[in-house]
Amino acid sequence: HELLISSGVGARLESAAIPFYPGAQEAAAQGLIPGGAYRNLDYYQNAVQWQGDSALKDDTLILLADPQTSGGLLIAVPPARLEALLASLAQSGVAGRAIGTIEEAPAGTMIIA
């Protein structure tokens, strides 16, 4: 969110491309959510626009806001360099994937599809 604000752009995130820990979605469906996730979601609610499957909205958003999963590394790279970056990461034994794109949108906006 801070990267988007400082760059004056928004992002479109593809929820199906975002990896979750094994069992995380099942735990969320059972209501096993840390309190910090609700506080994070409340803090970012005005920056998030949901455009995905409405049946998946609540569980997906709360998982994206889970403070236990906030340690992942996010890299912004020009589209022309994406494949080279992913290949380099794979060669180094690091799992990488594209989860979204930067878009012209109000600064800090996160569109989740």
How should each PLM-predicted stretch be described?
Residues H1-A113:
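Glycine-/charge-enriched secondary-structure boundary and capping motifs
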